Amino acid sequence: MTNADEGGFGGQTAKGELPRHEATDPRGQMHRKKRSMPDADTREFLRAQNVAHVGTVDAKGWPYVVPLIYVYEGNDYLYLHTGNHHGHFLQNIQRNPRVCVEVGAMGPVHRGHPFACNSALVFTSVIAFGPVRIITDRDKKSWFFDQVLAKYGEPSWTFEPGYPLLDRIILYEQRIEMVTGKHSEGLYH
């Protein structure tokens, strides 16, 4: 990933990075380009956060967003899972696999003067677009849960080996086509 004007996810560039967006595709266009995050910072932020808000669209055109845990290792794939084999998320994905993933973190609000509307929020956000597919391979599902436990669990936890309930979960792999990272230092930018 690079600054929005230089490319990022969606096909290899000369630098080995993935283009962020095509100039004609509004998904990756950022209004305030000075807040655009460099490639390495965007990847690290996406890897380090804990909750992804995943947006789909239902059959009637209504947006549907769910918070999910996820694994991202710095490449062009993001892994998510649900345990529901009959829910809205799965129905929406089966009809239209294109999703938008948002990962964000808020910092403090800087008080503005002389009016409240002059205040500004410190924040970081990453938005990733791309299709998802369902992964049925048990080895990949086991890998995912190993990664989840490493990311979210406590190092002192011990378990019996194996994952006997793998068939109860649905593992999704998002192929990231476009991504943008944005950071604001509030009033200190």
Task: Describe each PLM feature range.
Residues 2-34, 106-189:
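Charged, gly/pro-rich active-site loop segments
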Residues 12, 34, 43, 90-91, ...:
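Anion-coordinating catalytic cores for phosphoryl-, nucleotidyl-, and glycosidic chemistry
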Residues 25-75:
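An N-terminal domain-cap segment
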Residues 46, 92-93, 148:
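A generic structural signal for nonpolar/aromatic side chains embedded in well-ordered alpha-helices
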Residues 50, 66, 74-76, 95-102, ...:
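A generic structural signal for short beta-strands and their flanking turns/coil linkers
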Residues 56-58, 82, 103-105, 176-178:
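Short, structured patches in soluble enzyme cores that scaffold and shape functional sites
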Residues 65, 79-80, 134:
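A sequence-level detector of short linear motifs
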Residues 71-109:
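A short mixed-secondary-structure module that forms the rim of ligand-binding clefts
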